[in-house]
Amino acid sequence: MDDEVREKLIEAGKILKQAVNEAAEKIAPGVKILEVAEFVENRIIELGAKPAFPANISINSDAAHFTPKKNDERTFKEGDVVKLDVGAHIDGYIADMAVTVDLGDNTELVKAAKEALEAAMEVVRAGVSVSEIGKAIEDAITNYGFKPIVNLTGHGLLPYLNHAPPSIYNYATEKGVTLEEGMVVAIEPFATNGVGKVGERGECEIYSLLNPRPVRMKMAREILKEVEENYKTLPFAKRWLKKAPDIIISKLAREGVLRAYPVLTEVSGGLVSQWEHTLIVEDGGATITTK
């Protein structure tokens, strides 16, 4: 990894850490979810980076991919378990970070995912198998009496690609990819008091450009032009676009031009906690860009 790339990764992480920590302090009962999402996204820009994807603010049994709609009036409530998962990039070099804010009495659930992340980061180094990382995560979560979510993973990060190989499972697998020096990875344990699996629910506000190709409708062409120019292959929120009629966005997703990211929720309705950091893999350890 050359010095310029490393500097951009570390700067993106530094900016993201500040923005996320400031945003987390604003999460409280009665506050609009949209207010926090817009704050953290705008703060990233103010500090000199760009959002790598829309702020995910998934609450209670929702684990991932919830972002508010334009003019969304929904608010945080007493008792909520709030996951704030945000990304920032500089010239496509991405940092990814998540924290959980507990507005109720779920201290142990929150600690389970946080300690799982700490345990996982302790074993990250060039030459380690992702199965060893998964075991560290699983052991930490099950020690608290909770379950890891088995179908959500940590992941690699590449320029303008926020989910790349390798997948880093939150449990011990029989085989696994070996981490290499210079890899950039996001480790994100999810803990739950449910059965440990997520499924899709209907709501979807996040999309990315999957297969750019000519389309007939004028407004569809305008949407794709805006997406290509501003977000490239990174995910975007419908509320970020000048115009985003549901019927056109849905049609582009059905046709495979856009990829949809529906909200993922714990299938048994269990509460979910999450913590995440981004790491540059090195010989003998790693640099955590978001800590």
Swiss-Prot record:
A divalent metal cation 1 binds at residues 85, 96, 276. Belongs to the peptidase M24A family. Methionine aminopeptidase archaeal type 2 subfamily. This is Methionine aminopeptidase. Its EC number is 3.4.11.18. It comes from Archaeoglobus fulgidus (strain ATCC 49558 / DSM 4304 / JCM 9628 / NBRC 100126 / VC-16). The keyword Protease applies. Binds 2 divalent metal cations per subunit. Has a high-affinity and a low affinity metal-binding site. The true nature of the physiological cofactor is under debate. The enzyme is active with cobalt, zinc, manganese or divalent iron ions. Most likely, methionine aminopeptidases function as mononuclear Fe(2+)-metalloproteases under physiological conditions, and the catalytically relevant metal-binding site has been assigned to the histidine-containing high-affinity site. PROSITE patterns: MAP_2. The lineage of its organism: Archaea, Methanobacteriati, Methanobacteriota, Archaeoglobi, Archaeoglobales. A divalent metal cation 2 binds at residues 96, 155, 188, 276. One of its GO terms (cellular component) is cytoplasm.
